[in-house]
């Protein structure tokens, strides 16, 4: 059986990356919430 997690940096960044977050209003809300919470990492990064 094939495992479900097949890592790909490109796919990861296109789905959860900074540019995608900034491109929508809801994405910017996510970033601002994470800044307000004091997250060290705002986005997933490899």
From Swiss-Prot:
Lineage summary: Bacteria, Pseudomonadati, Pseudomonadota, Gammaproteobacteria, Enterobacterales
Alphabetical keyword list: Ribonucleoprotein, Ribosomal protein
GO cellular component: ribonucleoprotein complex; ribosome
Keyword Cell membrane included in the entry's annotation: no
Protein family membership: Belongs to the bacterial ribosomal protein bL34 family.
PANTHER family: LARGE RIBOSOMAL SUBUNIT PROTEIN BL34M, MITOCHONDRIAL RIBOSOMAL PROTEIN 34 FAMILY MEMBER
Top-rank taxon: Bacteria
InterPro entries: Ribosomal_bL34, Ribosomal_bL34_CS
Gene Ontology annotations of biological process type: translation
Protein name: Large ribosomal subunit protein bL34
């Amino acid at each position: 059986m094939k495992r479900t997690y097949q890592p790909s940096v490109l796919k990861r960044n296109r789905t959860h990356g900074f540019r995608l977050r900034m491109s929508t209003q809801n994405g910017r809300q996510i970033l601002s919430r994470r800044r307000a919470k004091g997250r060290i990492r705002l986005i997933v990064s490899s």
